[in-house]
Amino acid sequence: MRKTPKNLESLHKFAEAYAKLSRTYFCIDQSITALVIEGLARHKDDYGAPLCPCRHYENKKTEVLAAYWNCPCVPMRERKECHCMLFLQPSNEFSGESQLISKDDLQKHLS
């Protein structure tokens, strides 16, 4: 069993709040939502910022300082384009109908 990131709860709350703020929705597949939130929390633990976990970086520390891919990333803020499929526009075929994921569902998909 993996160790739970210490920032999991704060990134969980952030994701729900930002989905509401941006009028986007979580993926219909809750395992994607859970894994992305976990990845953001791990990067926050390791690098001090929620760097997008769905991209490859030559140097994560440099990317954190550049801030372009820190969540919410520039493409998300400017065009509502989330590479990770965490924040989806309602018209996206993978968009669910929820801006919330329960703590139990989050943990279930991370176990």
Curated annotation (Swiss-Prot):
Its cofactor is [4Fe-4S] cluster. The active site is at 54 (nucleophile). The record marks 83 as: Increases the nucleophilicity of the active site Cys. It is found in: Plastid, Chloroplast. [4Fe-4S] cluster binds at residues 52, 71, 73, 82. It catalyses: [thioredoxin]-disulfide + 2 reduced [2Fe-2S]-[ferredoxin] + 2 H(+) = [thioredoxin]-dithiol + 2 oxidized [2Fe-2S]-[ferredoxin]. Its EC number is 1.8.7.2. InterPro entries: FTR_bsu (IPR004209), FTR_bsu_Cyanobacter (IPR024707), FTR_bsu_sf (IPR036644). Disulfide bonds join 54-84. Keywords: 4Fe-4S, Chloroplast, Disulfide bond, Iron, Iron-sulfur, Metal-binding, Oxidoreductase, Plastid, Redox-active center. One of its GO terms (cellular component) is chloroplast. Binds 1 [4Fe-4S] cluster. It holds the Pfam family FeThRed_B. It is an enzyme of class 1 (oxidoreductase). Catalytic subunit of the ferredoxin-thioredoxin reductase (FTR), which catalyzes the two-electron reduction of thioredoxins by the electrons provided by reduced ferredoxin. Heterodimer of subunit A (variable subunit) and subunit B (catalytic subunit). Heterodimeric FTR forms a complex with ferredoxin and thioredoxin. This is Ferredoxin-thioredoxin reductase, catalytic chain.
